[in-house]
Amino acid sequence: MLTKRIIPCLDCDLQVPEGRVVKGVEFKEIKYAGNPVDLATRYYEMGADEIVILDITASYERRATMADVIDRLTENVFIPICVGGGIRKVEDYTKMLKAGADKCSTNTAAIKNPELLTEASKVVGSQAVVVGIDAKRRYVDNPSDAPDKNVVETDEGYCWFDCSIYGGREFTGMDAIEWAVKCQELGAGEILLTSMDGDGTKEGYDIALNKAINDAIDIPVIASGGGGNPAHILDVFQKTDVSAALAASIFHFNQYSINDVKQYLKENNVPVRL
């Protein structure tokens, strides 16, 4: 049985020389959490299975990617690193991988130019091509109210999931389930799935969203958005077949350690690497 992965996420603001890690609520209300190199090193030493580093300003402000940060970070961190933000062309993938990253995640650029996924997968391999999907619930009274969408029944009512771009600043009207299927067809090797409704709230992962996407595709899904305690992480692993859970707030602000989470999962019969 494959072990489930626990992945800390570093949302980076590179407007200061060393970079700084930030965390918000529903992509807003930003708080500062520390230096990306220091935090990544700490999480590696705590037993993280992988680290996701997102340049949250690159796509919106059209600034350069964070190759220099990755280069410094990988001097002391020896687990897979996934980098996102400002990945717009195949050369960005190769630049990040040469700097020491193992995977690159793209959101906006993939939606604007889906063929990027095919081109990148041919050059760097599907295993290095991750698509970030930032999805928000759109409620409807009945499935017939959205005939061209994949409507899901949740405890809160019927809804479909709308893809956003530019760090949650713009919505596309694209169905997230349909887009995930398309990403797999185009050559993506993994989906980083963030619930915009849950992001930073620490109220639990969106089970309906994660189950719907995971059940529709064969490539791994990383659940993101809403993890507030070990029970939330257990919940998403027990109720869906996602391969990994990503969290930020609970680790950045020392509420729980990665080892706390893994011990709890092991005690509840979830396979993890200790």
Swiss-Prot record:
<keyword id="KW-0028">Amino-acid biosynthesis</keyword>
<dbReference type="InterPro" id="IPR006062">
    <property type="entry name" value="His_biosynth"/>
</dbReference>
<dbReference type="GO" id="GO:0016829">
    <property type="term" value="F:lyase activity"/>
</dbReference>
<keyword id="KW-0456">Lyase</keyword>
<feature type="active site">
    <location>
        <position position="11"/>
    </location>
</feature>
<dbReference type="InterPro" id="IPR011060">
    <property type="entry name" value="RibuloseP-bd_barrel"/>
</dbReference>
<comment type="subunit">
    <text>Heterodimer of HisH and HisF.</text>
</comment>
<keyword id="KW-0963">Cytoplasm</keyword>
<feature type="active site">
    <location>
        <position position="134"/>
    </location>
</feature>
<keyword id="KW-0368">Histidine biosynthesis</keyword>
<dbReference type="GO" id="GO:0000107">
    <property type="term" value="F:imidazoleglycerol-phosphate synthase activity"/>
</dbReference>
<comment type="function">
    <text>IGPS catalyzes the conversion of PRFAR and glutamine to IGP, AICAR and glutamate. The HisF subunit catalyzes the cyclization activity that produces IGP and AICAR from PRFAR using the ammonia provided by the HisH subunit.</text>
</comment>
<comment type="pathway">
    <text>Amino-acid biosynthesis; L-histidine biosynthesis; L-histidine from 5-phospho-alpha-D-ribose 1-diphosphate: step 5/9.</text>
</comment>
<comment type="similarity">
    <text>Belongs to the HisA/HisF family.</text>
</comment>
<dbReference type="InterPro" id="IPR004651">
    <property type="entry name" value="HisF"/>
</dbReference>
<dbReference type="GO" id="GO:0000105">
    <property type="term" value="P:L-histidine biosynthetic process"/>
</dbReference>
<dbReference type="InterPro" id="IPR050064">
    <property type="entry name" value="IGPS_HisA/HisF"/>
</dbReference>
<dbReference type="InterPro" id="IPR013785">
    <property type="entry name" value="Aldolase_TIM"/>
</dbReference>
<dbReference type="Pfam" id="PF00977">
    <property type="entry name" value="His_biosynth"/>
</dbReference>
<dbReference type="GO" id="GO:0005737">
    <property type="term" value="C:cytoplasm"/>
</dbReference>
<protein>
    <recommendedName>
        <fullName>Imidazole glycerol phosphate synthase subunit HisF</fullName>
        <ecNumber>4.3.2.10</ecNumber>
    </recommendedName>
</protein>
